[in-house]
Swiss-Prot record:
Compositionally biased intervals (Pro residues): 308-344
Keyword entries, A-Z: Apoptosis, Cytoplasm, Cytoplasmic vesicle, Nucleus, Repeat
Subunit and partners: Interacts with RPL14, EIF3S7 and PABPC4.
Name this protein carries in UniProt: Pleckstrin homology-like domain family A member 1
Subcellular location: Cytoplasm; Cytoplasmic vesicle; Nucleus, Nucleolus
Ranges of Low complexity composition bias in the record: 190-204
Function: Seems to be involved in regulation of apoptosis. May be involved in detachment-mediated programmed cell death. May mediate apoptosis during neuronal development. May be involved in regulation of anti-apoptotic effects of IGF1. May be involved in translational regulation.
Domain PH positions: 151-283
Domain of life: Eukaryota
Region (Disordered): 39-67, 190-222, 293-401
Length: 401
């Protein structure tokens, strides 16, 4: 028979698991944080039940507590005194019921009506309260050195890229060019260095001017950049998508140009998603205007460089009058029509043939032979040319007849 987990038996007996095993911190099985910080799980719309009322309803008193202590010894857990009753807001039973609800893991953000609120100890709370005072001073110095202006500063929760996908707080600074993410621990370190520097500066007037070189070490260390500083530049940012409101948080996803998606959440009152979207659109509009101006300037430079190239076509016009003497060979072609009158007398030969025939009748008696002989000698050569004309004339005469 499989033994039930120790945490479940402790819950059945009504004891919070103060020591021993620790459940994984995702999705909603956290019972104790690192450093034994108490974790408060609060269900939306649920009224916190005081610890005294819960013990009365369950009907468990000190007898159950003693049996729980003996059970701890039997289950090989460390024997320890039962602590005092926790504050009324620490409802472990209600929180675990919320964690075991069906569909808790099916939601997109891994939560279903329950929120994890870490309550650090008193010493950590003091440091946490001093974080905002030290953060902007260091961030302002860093931005002034780079020439950027901080438009908004605050704390965002970023989903980690690991297997557990925990929400981690990041000190965020929104500028005109992107979003800076700084871990809070680094700001605490910078704040401690600043406090040491201030203390040394206060001690200097009492000790005298003999130790002016000692504070140089912390001063230089305070100006050192953090080890892990992530910048989400607007040039690599594509859109701000998947805006969802659940409870008091606003969830949104920053989609980068590479296809990477980074999940954030913040209180709804802060409106980080709207500010990031607005600054991203303004940045891209400025870049588009600069691109248009640069193209126009390039075109103007090209137009200014073209006028010196204009005198080049002018010498091309000068060789144009050179082809004018070309018409001079035309008069040489004029003597070509001169041989044309030569064939004219040849063409006249066929024409006189019809004429001598009517006249040959009256003159045929006195001079029948001497005239036809001189004409018959040249006729054999042009006869091929004259035959078509003769036939045409005969046909015309026949038609006229």
């Amino acid at each position: 028979m499989r033994r039930a987990p120790a945490a479940e038996r402790l819950l059945e007996l009504g004891f919070p698991p103060r020591c021993g095993r620790q459940e994984p911190p995702f999705p909603l099985g956290v019972t104790r944080g690192w450093g034994r910080w108490p974790i408060q799980k609060r269900r939306e719309g649920a009224r916190p039940v005081p610890f005294s009322e819960r013990s009365q309803e369950d009907g468990r008193g000190p007898a159950a507590r003693s049996s729980g202590t003996l059970w701890r010894i039997r289950t090989r857990l460390s024997l320890c005194r039962d602590p005092e009753p926790p504050p009324p807001l620490c409802l472990l039973r209600v929180s675990l019921l919320c964690a075991l609800r069906a569909g808790g893991r099916g939601s997109r953000w891994g939560e279903d009506g329950a929120r994890l609120l870490l309550l650090p100890p008193a010493r950590a709370a003091g440091n946490g309260e001093a974080e905002p005072s030290g953060g902007p001073s260091y961030a302002g110095r860093m931005l002034e050195s780079s020439g950027c202006k901080a438009l908004k500063e605050g704390v965002l929760e970023k989903r980690s890229d690991g297997l557990l996908q925990l929400w981690k707080k990041k000190c965020c600074i929104l500028t005109e060019e992107g979003l800076l993410l700084i871990p809070p621990k680094q700001l605490q370190h910078q704040q401690q260095q600043q406090q040491q520097q201030q203390q040394q500066q206060q001690q200097q007037p009492g000790q005298g001017p003999a130790e002016p070189s000692q504070p140089s070490g912390p001063a230089v260390a305070s100006l050192e950049p953090p080890v892990k500083l992530k910048e989400l530049h607007f040039s690599n940012m594509k859109t701000v998508d998947c805006v969802e409101r659940k409870g008091k948080y606003m969830y949104f996803t920053v989609v980068m140009a590479e296809g990477k998606e980074i999940d954030f959440r913040c209180p709804q009152d802060q409106g980080w998603n709207a500010e990031i979207t607005l600054q991203m659109v303004q940045y891209k509009n400025r870049q588009a205007i600069l691109a248009v101006k640069s193209t126009r300037q390039k075109q103007q430079h090209l137009v200014q460089q073209q006028p010196p190239s204009q005198p080049q076509p002018q010498p091309q016009l000068q060789p144009q009058p050179q082809p004018q003497p070309q018409p001079q060979p035309q008069p040489q072609s004029q003597p070509q029509p001169q041989p044309q009158p030569k064939p004219q007398p040849q063409q006249l030969h066929p024409y006189p043939h019809p004429h001598p025939h009517p006249h040959s009748h009256p003159h045929s008696h006195p001079h029948p032979h001497p005239h036809p002989h001189p004409h018959q000698i040249p006729h054999p050569h042009p006869q091929p040319h004259s035959q078509p004309h003769g036939h045409r004339l005969l046909r015309s005469t026949s038609n006229s007849a």
